[in-house]
Design a protein with these regions (language model features):
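Hydrophobic face of amphipathic alpha-helices that form TPR/SEL1-like repeat modules
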Residues: 1-59, 63-64
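Glycine-rich loop-to-alpha-helix module at the N-terminal edge of alpha/beta enzyme cores
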Residues: 49, 55-152
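Generic beta-strand/beta-sheet core signal
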Residues: 55-57, 118, 133, 144, ...
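Secondary-structure transition/capping motifs at alpha-helix termini
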Residues: 90, 110, 147-152, 198, ...
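Hydrophobic packing residues within well-ordered alpha-helices of enzyme cores
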Residues: 141, 214-217, 245, 266
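Conserved small-residue-rich beta-alpha loop and adjacent elements
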Residues: 154-228
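Conserved NAD(P)+-binding/catalytic subdomain of aldehyde/semialdehyde dehydrogenases
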Residues: 161, 169, 173-178, 223-284
């Protein structure tokens, strides 16, 4: 169904045309600085009183933009919306889910330098590192599209006389994705798209220092035609919504990359069974 997987190539910025194109992308991004981005839960864009201001760490006086700061109530709503979307998304074929992923990868590829420029400004990555992060994000999306189709097939089991046995992998529900600031697109995409490819749904709580790159990713998710609620964008302070998302009795899994301290906290809290919780959580 899909062409064989090939890694996204890197650009050679000693080529004048590539250098010029990246400078154009940087100029275009600078024209968008200061834009505000709302929480996205399903089809709804939600404004809040609290705002998270993002600044260029290499030039702290430069405001990159702002994102709405979600509270505990919105965290609850986002989990419920993810479960509503799971009912339909989990029933789609792996091929259909894969097509959504391939469309997303194509959109990311079309805006590769723009996304890289956002990383240069919001995360202070140099050109090579910024583009490498975006290329890795595209690789994750393309790779998981193909893996979704492969893993949808029955798994070989040991034959036993007199029995007919099959083993299948199935999606498990709604989860939470908490990516770091230093690889704000690649790790976000990898931790979010893997579960989504398998038929799960997610709530993405981006790092508070790089919420704008995550907002741009969310725009592409919407443009790619993903059903509302499959991926939800929930910027907010970890101290305010982190425990709510991790502790929620309907959170099935937590994908986290970050500090040892926070990782141990998530692992510990995920192990506690909450009232009304039906399954043990999985913290990765």
């Amino acid at each position: 169904m899909f062409q064989p997987f090939v890694n996204e190539p890197y650009s050679d910025f000693t080529v004048p045309a590539n250098e010029a194109a990246y400078r154009v992308a940087l100029a275009g991004v600078r024209e968008q600085l200061g834009t505000h981005y709302p929480v996205v839960i399903g089809e709804e864009s939600v404004e809040t009183k609290r705002r998270i201001e993002s600044v260029n760490p290499g030039r702290p006086s430069e405001v990159v933009g702002s994102a709405a700061g979600a509270d505990a109530e919105l965290a609850e709503r986002s989990i419920e919306m993810a479960w509503l979307a799971f009912a339909g998304w989990s029933q789609r074929s792996a091929e259909d889910r894969g097509r959504h992923l391939v469309k997303l990868a194509a959109l990311m590829r079309d805006r590769k330098y723009e996304l890289s420029a956002w990383e240069t400004i919001e995360a202070s990555k140099n050109w090579l590192e910024a583009e490498a992060d975006v290329a890795e994000a595209i690789d994750f999306v393309e790779y998981y599209a193909r893996q979704a189709v492969r893993l949808a097939q029955p798994i070989d089991v040991v034959a036993y006389p007199g029995e007919e046995n099959e083993s299948h992998l199935i999606p498990i529900g709604a989860g939470v994705v908490i990516p770091p600031w230093n690889f704000p697109l690649a790790i976000l995409a990898g931790m979010a798209i893997g579960p989504v490819a398998a038929g799960n749904t997610v709530v993405v709580k981006p790092a508070s220092t790089t919420p704008i790159i995550a907002a741009k990713f969310m725009e592409l998710v919407q443009a790619a035609g993903f059903p509302p609620g499959v991926i939800n964008y929930l910027p907010g302070a970890g101290s305010e919504i982190g425990d709510v998302l991790v502790d929620h009795p309907r959170t099935r899994f937590v994908n986290f990359t970050g500090s040892k301290e926070v990782g141990l906290r998530i692992a510990e809290r995920s192990a506690h069974v909450q009232p009304g919780q039906l399954w043990l959580k999985r913290a990765f």
